[in-house]
Amino acid sequence: MAERANLVFHNKVIGGTAIKRIISRLIDHFGMAYTSHILDQVKTLGFRQATTTSISLGIDDLLTIPSKGWLVQDAEQQSLILEKHHHYGNVHAVEKLRQSIEIWYATSEYLRQEMNPNFSMTDPFNPVHIMSFSGARGNASQVHQLVGMRGLMSDPQGQMIDLPIQSNLREGLSLTEYIISCYGARKGVVDTAVRTSDAGYLTRRLVEVVQHIVVRRTDCGTVRGISVNTRNRMMSERILIQTLIGRVLADDIYIGSRCIVVRNQDIGIGLINRFINFQTQPIFIRTPFTCRNTSWICRLCYGRSPIHGNLVELGEAVGIIAGQSIGEPGTQLTLRTFHTGGVFTGGTAEYVRSPSNGKIKFNENSAYPTRTRHGHPAFLCYIDLYVTIESNDIMHNVIIPPKSFLLVQNDQYVKSEQIIAEIRAGTYTLNLKEKVRKHIFSDSEGEMHWSTNIYHVSEFAYSNVHILPKTSHLWILSGNSHKSDTVSLSLLKDQDQMSTHSLPTAKRNTSNFLVSNNQVRLCPDHCHFMHPTISPDTSNLLAKKRRNRFIIPFLFRSIRERNNELMPDISVEIPIDGIIHKNSILAYFDDPQYRTQSSGIAKYKTIGIHSIFQKEDLIEYRGIREFKPKYQIKVDRFFFIPQEVHILSESSSIMVRNNSIIGVNTPITLNKKSRVGGLVRVEKNKKKIELKIFSGDIHFPGEIDKISQHSAILIPPEMVKKKNSKESKKKTNWRYIQWITTTKKKYFVLVRPVILYDIADSINLVKLFPQDLFKEWDNLELKVLNFILYGNGKSIRGILDTSIQLVRTCLVLNWNEDEKSSSIEEALASFVEVSTNGLIRYFLRIDLVKSHISYIRKRNDPSSSGLISYNESDRININPFFSIYKENIQQSLSQKHGTIRMLLNRNKENRSFIILSSSNCFQMGPFNNVKYHNGIKEEINQFKRNHKIPIKISLGPLGVAPQIANFFSFYHLITHNKISSIKKNLQLNKFKETFQVIKYYLMDENERIYKPDLYNNIILNPFHLNWDFIHPNYCEKTFPIISLGQFICENVCIVQTKNGPNLKSGQVITVQMDFVGIRLANPYLATPGATIHGHYGEMLYEGDILVTFIYEKSRSGDITQGLPKVEQVLEVRSIDSISMNLEKRIDAWNERITGILGIPWRFLIGAELTIAQSRISLVNKIQRVYRSQGVHIHNRHIEIIVRQITSKVLVSEDGMSNVFSPGELIGLLRAQRTGRALEESICYRTLLLGITKTSLNTQSFISEASFQETARVLAKAALRGRIDWLKGLKENLVLGGIIPVGTGFKKIGDRSSARQDTKITLETIKIIRGRN
């Protein structure tokens, strides 16, 4: 009794780990027999108490937390708001994912924290509450899912499933929640997909790898080991003790100069405490990694046996023990994943809350604006930020730590307990994160658009990946795409606007901008027409823009009877100010038949020459600078006398003399040769020398007086009649005779060849323009005139190898003066440019302007006054080209009346087109409650209020102009005083004083802006065009400004109306006083680091990959936790994502280490160092998985397994070819020994083999054949002549021999020792005899 009274009584709960420690200490003190007796008494006591208590578990014991209902409702509300922000384009997919995880994780964690107080208050002796904290079966997390909620789950790939499980097992799961739960919870049939039998199969594979590892020697003699640092703060004391206890030291340990522990001494708990207290240097311990043989292991490298606490005995099968030690807890890992597997976890951040109500103030210079990981605007502070909250009488100071987010603005009023800052989590969580990719898919079909914040050039050649340097929006503009395989692309033109119900099937329909009888025309005071610059009979237009001139190549088909021959360019020229006067040249054409490559002189008979400077019948010519002056010639032919001209500097060395005769390719200077032969004439002009070469024949006349006194004459060809024929034939061509006088007063005649040009009727340029253009304006004239660009007798000199144009055909615009157009003195012309993926088309628009107000009425309908309303019968045909519509296209477009836009593929071929129809647009308005200051709004034309804009009203033939009928229906007049009518004789100055015209702009699908202004018809920059709802002079208050082409997100309030904010997101394409037309679009937010797939303007379909985000996420307790993750590591499957910048990091590290060591660092990393680091990394990964599940395994068991899967190397092609074949797998120690024996360098590569491959690459083919692929293994072994030395357990077991472990090892050991004794005896006798 006295001894029992001295014992200490511990009144505390003992868990499973504490019981293990007690049993270990009992074995040390009392031995195995007495310890087993004590444990029997503990078992009896436990069963007796459990029987007495008689706790039962029923479904009524599962008590649901009362606050769960409103917590889940609040989480759903936050998720709904988050979904709206994502739809509006405020947050991207990754930010939505992160915030969704945190919302549901915080809700689930709050329910788990509320679970214990709820049980304690309502039912402290609840069986569920007692069992969950006893440690016998279950834990708080499992009970939490019984009475709380699971939250978000993961799919088999580890990706989050958006639908959270809100129900618990007490309430019952829905069918969807049950299926989602099955992925991680391993229930039912779903469990077969993840193989519950992995635990047993893993044990078998582990034993196969290490079954031959037996302790065969006491010491292998190695001097190597691994180091363990006792000062490592990242390693807890418990893990340090588990790592060191039972090991053997590989080196002596010193404290100063004193040796406290010698080598080859095993480490007990006493030595470990001394190491921790003295903080010694790193300790080198022996390990199975450093043992000198792979087929067995020594006692000192293994250490103490965990059974009895002493060094392991010889003959012990430590390999099988290691395999079972790792495989057996796999059943526990599988069971532990039953409830908690697959639950997506996250970390809740720490928040700083306001202590009271007041206004917050801080130093803005110490904080920088940024985005939080949830996409919210915030300020990031890099240093301690002092925040002051001023209330009525009290000032509160709050210190925000560095790298935290401030969630409020300066001078903002905050309420008490409001979150003002978020403290970023520590860096210790970085080890638990991994980089993953998330693909964002397009939700709709349409056209991709992005801003200048995105690199338009692909990152790599022949790639469609673009890098995002700044945060930007991607927009998918709505539109319907159709393949055009069945339609001839030469018939279907880009930017055609089709209305299929008005076009017959498979019928050719040739239509221009203004056709048919029931047209809409302008009043006589204003003429407007617009037409293509080429005829419908020509092919598609590709134009080049040079300054203010457009060069348009086209194909001749019938004009010169040349089939599809590419002819030179027609240039349509518009002045910079856009003003064209009468008799102005509108277009010109350079005929190639009047083009020459050589210099010369033009000669012609001047029947009528009109200079462009004449006042009467003025022909205004704006040509190229070289052609001055220009002449209009009324002749039918002219002559061209060729000659070669060279302009040389004074310093040039001329190698020919004046008046000399040279041949072809005669050197003129050091670097020039003549192209023709003839007479050389040298003339000095100012600082230049002009050298001419006249080709022809030279004649020396006998009598000078008989020669004509003309200095130069043209002689026509002689006509010679043939004998016995009435026909005559030209004997010679035209000749030019020139009188030459030399310096010595010698005379001779030079007869030069002449080229005759007949000016015939050239191309009728009028035919290239639609005839309806002239019908619309009766007195409009277009006439063709020929211009000779050089004067009579003027020298024509070419520049280098450029050709010289002699005649130019011009198209002159003119109109007759009559009563209707007496005051029209000028016309306004402009080009409309349409660019579609590199395909550029230009259209010409001309306005004959008299006054600045115009009215619209039907032709021949004087009863109609003012403006007409829109109806189907008044609609003109607006297709500027002919098209053939086949039946399938008509069916596909029967519900889609819209404008066509061609889409080009990579080969610049039209393969599909997109149609912008009414269903792709949204009308916002009307804005009827907008107030005016002393102003009255007049609607000139009433439109039917519909949320869908009729595309035929808003978009014209190119998408850049509405129909003529409704051209001015978009104008609204605001006046100081109400005016009942507008008189026709209203003068311009009065109009300016009376009216304020609100301009209307329109934009097509190609983002070109059209402004129907009578004065300036240029294409405007969409980013500089702003428009107000009302003229600023009449606004009572400021309204938001809308930019044409601007992208507007959904739920954005543009103007204060009864209709509320904008209901749709898209791009502004129509702006009117009463409404704004928006092309529907879906926004996608992308942040820096994301990659965009596709090109600008490319057509995307629903489901296509749009953006790829790369982000870090916490490793969740997904389906690969526990046993499957251990299997992944042991089979050497990749479970970590490799950093995409790994190569750049290695290059940077290589540069730095080269400067330090003088050699690249890669030469320092050999195969041996790589194997050592890989072994340590694999051991740590496996231990991390088991420790996370509460399972403790000694490192030596894992080291034996890892040692086997890392002991093979791959022979390189350039090494040991005389011993091993390239690509052969051999042991590492075997390769090293062979290299030492051959005395040559060893070339091999490290290799990590999984446990399955290692089992099939052993020294025993019997062991391999009994594991897998029996026939293949035996056949290869027979062909190779392999020998099995029967060193392992399995092969001896198969053949019925003695297993070389335990007593069997002793028998083998006795045989080998007897042989060794005999050998020693013989050697001893030999030595004794040698001494005699």
Curated annotation (Swiss-Prot):
Q: Its domain of life?
A: Eukaryota
Q: Which residues form the signal peptide?
A: none
Asked if Secreted is a keyword of the record, the answer is: no
Task: Please write the reaction equations for the catalytic activity of this protein.
Answer: RNA(n) + a ribonucleoside 5'-triphosphate = RNA(n+1) + diphosphate
Pfam family example for this protein? Answer: RNA_pol_Rpb1_5
Cofactor note, please?
A: Binds 1 Zn(2+) ion per subunit.
What is one GO cellular-component annotation here? chloroplast
Question: Where does the UniProt annotation locate this protein?
Answer: Plastid, Chloroplast
Gene Ontology MF term list: DNA binding; DNA-directed RNA polymerase activity; zinc ion binding
Instruction: Write down the InterPro entries for this protein, in alphabetical order.
Output: DNA-dir_RpoC2_beta_pp (IPR012756), RNA_pol_beta''_euk (IPR050254), RNA_pol_Rpb1_3_sf (IPR042102), RNA_pol_Rpb1_4 (IPR007083), RNA_pol_Rpb1_5 (IPR007081), Rpb1_funnel_sf (IPR038120)
Query: What positions does the entry give for Zn(2+) binding?
Result: C220, C291, C298, C301
A single GO BP term for this record reads: DNA-templated transcription
This protein's major location comes to plastid
The Enzyme Commission number assigned here is 2.7.7.6
UniProt cofactor(s):
Zn(2+)
Keywords, alphabetical: Chloroplast, DNA-directed RNA polymerase, Metal-binding, Nucleotidyltransferase, Plastid, Transcription, Transferase, Zinc
The record's NCBIfam families line, in alphabetical order, gives: rpoC2_cyan (TIGR02388)
Summarizing the function annotation, the protein's role is: DNA-dependent RNA polymerase catalyzes the transcription of DNA into RNA using the four ribonucleoside triphosphates as substrates.
Complexes and interactors: In plastids the minimal PEP RNA polymerase catalytic core is composed of four subunits: alpha, beta, beta', and beta''. When a (nuclear-encoded) sigma factor is associated with the core the holoenzyme is formed, which can initiate transcription.
PANTHER family registered for this protein in UniProt? DNA-DIRECTED RNA POLYMERASE SUBUNIT BETA
Family that this chain belongs to: Belongs to the RNA polymerase beta' chain family. RpoC2 subfamily.
What is the name attached to this protein's record? DNA-directed RNA polymerase subunit beta''
* Source species of the chain: Lotus japonicus
